[in-house]
A protein has these predicted regions:
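Extracellular ligand-binding/catalytic regions of CAZymes and related secreted enzymes
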Residues: 220-223, 230, 404-438, 478, ...
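Short helix-loop-beta junction
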Residues: 461-486
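Catalytic domains of carbohydrate-active enzymes, especially glycoside hydrolases
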Residues: 8, 14-49, 195-212, 332-333, ...
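A glycine-rich, often tryptophan-bearing local segment used as a flexible ligand/cofactor-contacting loop or short
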Residues: 517-594
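Noncatalytic N-terminal accessory/assembly modules of large enzymes
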Residues: 2-58, 62-97
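Hydrophobic targeting/anchoring helices
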Residues: 43, 62-64, 196-197, 207-214, ...
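The substrate-binding groove and active-site-proximal loops of carbohydrate-active enzymes
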Residues: 5-12, 28-34, 169-190, 273-290, ...
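Polysaccharide-binding and catalytic clefts of secreted carbohydrate-active enzymes
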Residues: 69-327, 345, 431
Length: 722
């Protein structure tokens, strides 16, 4: 077994001996610095590849302070304020950290700010309000009594939010606040290219420039107590300035409004059905950002080095699943791995030479402290991500943070050594091939490929009570035996043939969100295309409130193919008689007691006549199956990630595709164990996803079987005979 390569480790000025020891012990072939660390010159000649973290928009306060007009900006909205009798005064900075941002009253506020009557939805004419700089407040002289008002305004980011986050988490003392500057603007643009060349001249030993990241940070706001107030890992609200917005207006040919970004205070988060204006803005940003990225990567290449992009931080506009990214010149992607979905978020990116996953835990004091258990976190992270790696591998793994902290935990060092060796073996066995896929499935929502593997993700891989029952579907798919695609309603509208080759469509989420479509179902072309796909023999799985939008006598616009509807009160007058359960169904065959954990589930779902209810609780349908023409639909109220729910989804997809007969092909009877085949490479593996020993019967591709015992977390490799 190869015991060297494909691993990156962090270092620091005071960790040279530890770095040298772990280079050998973990078989690492690359070294990196991190935020808050420096690269020791003693390690230049180790033979390892050297990554240098490069901050395009910060770590140069001299420039930032000398050019305050080109500081980065964001749009922010005040809370709602209710008018009574007389004038209404709205303070702008309530609930916002003054360390983080300050009001931009330098640019024309009449053009770039907006006061909105939220009771009517109409903007207040600029003549009817004024700004008081001394109190940082907006006064509306004659508001409508008992109407609610907000102010949308531009603010300068005077402390980079990621640097603020790292400073707060690590309790850094007496650290100068790094001010982010806007590379899109003329002076800083020219300076940035010169600065990059000077950096490359003075760092000839660097092999890989690890851009962290490029130009615009995702939306991250803190309050006066330094608490996180608002976060959207996909948010574009900090990618704005009058300079950028004037360019946008010239391109699209219509006047910009702050509301295009503010979006009633929802900031166009991924649950909002995106407006035309917001999609136009994103497309504009992708083109502009990719062009500027290409300028920087061309410089890096001219010095004979590779350009790597960190998937996160200042990555807004990069959008690696969209075509503009392919023109950016990026050689490699590295990203943080929180689970299987975030692993696929990295490994599925097309057009780069290699991908790398930064595994958890990060070597920071929040985990590496007396009483901490970094081994447990490392095990959970590796075993969860391994499912996805076995479907679409990253090319490298790595860790980040303070190496000396990790070295205080010898059991952690032992475990990571085993992970590195296991990863190398895994990679050698599956590289260059596509694993066996039993079916092709497509997740259908408003975002499609742009949010591939990031559906239902508010912040990177963090749990939310309101969406874990939906995110679990994406997590299950990340390691399942399917070819997974992401399709948008716009894709279907543009070309219905996009569904050709798809076996099963999946629509997951709450009603009237971007994930289920909202008003798009009023478009007869979209509705008929999806229903026609199922009626002609396709499969459909709906989770939560699929197609949820009140229109023409239906709430669930996919009620016909799924055979269920939601009781909103409008149909209480109709009696419902279909309540018999059929728990002996193919989909439930592997479930303990033929029951399922639906997570938060859904209230008030009932079955239409002719629908087969699999599970109902107190006359609320949780799972149902339905024949629709030549096709089939499956309704599930929620499906949080678990090994048994992985199996439920697997069986549901096979049933929806009329392919129950293919169940015993590369299959384990124990749902805690999975089988992955790499036919081109003549290999297959059986993997125990749990922390306990497991016994199972394994079925191979020809339907033959054998019994197998696996130790905790164990993975066994076999050759495919014949």
């Amino acid at each position: 077994m190869n015991t060297k390569g494909r691993v990156t480790i962090p270092t620091d000025m005071d960790a040279v001996p530890e770095t040298l020891a772990l280079l050998k012990r973990w078989g690492a072939d690359a070294i990196r610095d991190c935020d808050g660390t420096e690269f020791p010159q003693e390690l230049k000649d180790t033979g390892a590849k050297i990554y240098a973290t490069y901050y395009t928009t910060r770590k140069d306060n001299a420039w930032a302070k000398a050019n305050p007009d080109e500081t980065q900006q964001c749009y922010i909205m005040t809370p709602f304020y209710t008018a009574a009798d007389g004038a209404l005064t709205i303070p702008l900075m309530t609930g916002i950290s003054r360390e983080l941002m300050k009001v931009n009253d330098h640019d024309d506020i009449a053009r770039w700010w907006e006061v909105i009557d939220r009771t009517t939805g109409e903007p207040v004419p600029t003549a009817d309000w004024h700004y008081d700089a001394a109190s940082e407040s907006v006064a509306i002289d004659a508001p409508a009594a008992y109407h609610e008002y907000t102010v949308s305004f531009l603010a300068y980011l005077i402390w980079d939010p990621v640097h603020m986050y790292n400073s707060v988490i690590n309790d850094w003392k007496d650290v100068e606040h790094q001010i982010p500057f806007d590379v899109r603007q003329p002076k800083t643009h020219a300076y940035t290219m010169r600065r990059l060349r000077e950096y490359l001249e003075s760092h000839p030993y660097v092999n890989v420039v690890r851009f962290t990241t490029f130009f615009h940070l995702f939306t991250l706001v803190f309050d006066e107590l330094r608490r996180e107030k608002y976060v959207d890992w996909y948010g574009y609200s900090a990618s704005v300035s009058p300079y950028i917005l004037e360019q946008f207006e010239k391109e699209v040919g219509y006047k910009f409004r702050p509301e295009f970004i503010i979006d009633q205070g929802y900031y166009n988060n991924q649950y909002r059905v995106p407006s035309k204006e917001y999609k136009d803005f994103q497309a504009f940003q992708r083109r502009e950002v990719a062009g500027l990225m290409k300028e920087m990567t061309d410089i890096v290449h001219a010095y004979g080095k590779e350009a790597m992009m960190f998937l996160g931080d200042h990555w807004i506009g990069c959008e690696p699943f969209m075509p503009e990214f392919q023109k950016s010149g990026v050689d490699a992607i590295v990203g943080s791995v929180g689970n299987g979905s975030t692993l696929r978020l990295i490994s599925d990116i097309p057009g780069v030479k290699y991908t790398e996953g930064r595994f958890l835990p990060y070597f920071f004091p929040d985990t590496f402290h007396e009483g901490g258990d970094p081994v447990r976190e490392a095990k959970e992270n590796w075993v969860t991500a391994r499912r996805a790696i076995l479907r679409k591998p990253i090319d490298r793994i790595g860790y980040g943070g303070y190496l000396k902290l990790a070295c205080e935990f010898p059991e952690f060092l032992d475990y990571v050594e085993s992970v590195c060796n296991e990863f190398r073996e895994l990679y050698e066995n599956i590289k260059g091939t596509t694993p066996y896929c039993v079916k092709t499935v497509a997740v259908l929502n408003s975002w499609g490929q742009q949010r591939a593997w990031g559906c239902h993700m508010v912040h990177h891989a963090l749990y939310q009570k309101q969406n874990y029952s939906y995110a679990g579907v994406i997590e299950a798919l990340s390691g399942a035996l399917f070819d997974v695609k992401f399709i948008s309603f716009d894709d279907i509208k543009a070309d219905p043939k996009v569904l050709d080759g798809i076996d099963v469509l999946i629509n997951v989420g709450d009603g009237d969100t971007a994930h289920t479509g909202g008003k798009v179902w009023e478009d007869p072309d979209v509705s008929a295309t999806v229903k026609g796909f199922v009626h002609r023999g396709g499969g459909l799985i709906g989770v939560g409130e699929p197609g949820g939008h009140q229109y023409q006598g239906r709430y669930l616009q996919l009620a016909a193919p799924l055979g269920v509807e939601k009781e909103t009160g409008f149909t209480l007058n109709y009696d419902k008689y279909n309540w018999d359960e059929h728990r002996d169904h193919f989909i439930l065959a592997d479930c303990p007691d033929h029951d399922v954990d639906f997570g938060e589930g859904k209230k008030s779902i009932f079955a239409l006549e002719g629908t087969e209810i699999l599970i109902q609780r107190d006359k609320e349908v949780q799972m149902a199956a339905h024949e629709y023409g030549q096709g089939r639909g499956v309704y599930i109220s929620g499906l949080p990630y678990s090994f048994v729910n992985n199996r439920v989804l697997y069986r549901a997809i096979l049933w929806a595709a009329h392919d129950e007969a293919d169940l015993h092909k590369w299959f384990s009877t124990n749902y805690n164990v999975e089988v992955h085949a790499y036919v081109k490479n003549g290999k297959y593996c059986v993997v125990n996803n749990t922390y306990e020993p497991q016994d199972t019967t394994v079925y191979t591709g020809d339907g033959s079987s054998f019994d197998l015992h696996l130790d905790a977390n164990e993975i066994k490799w076999y050759s495919i005979e014949g």
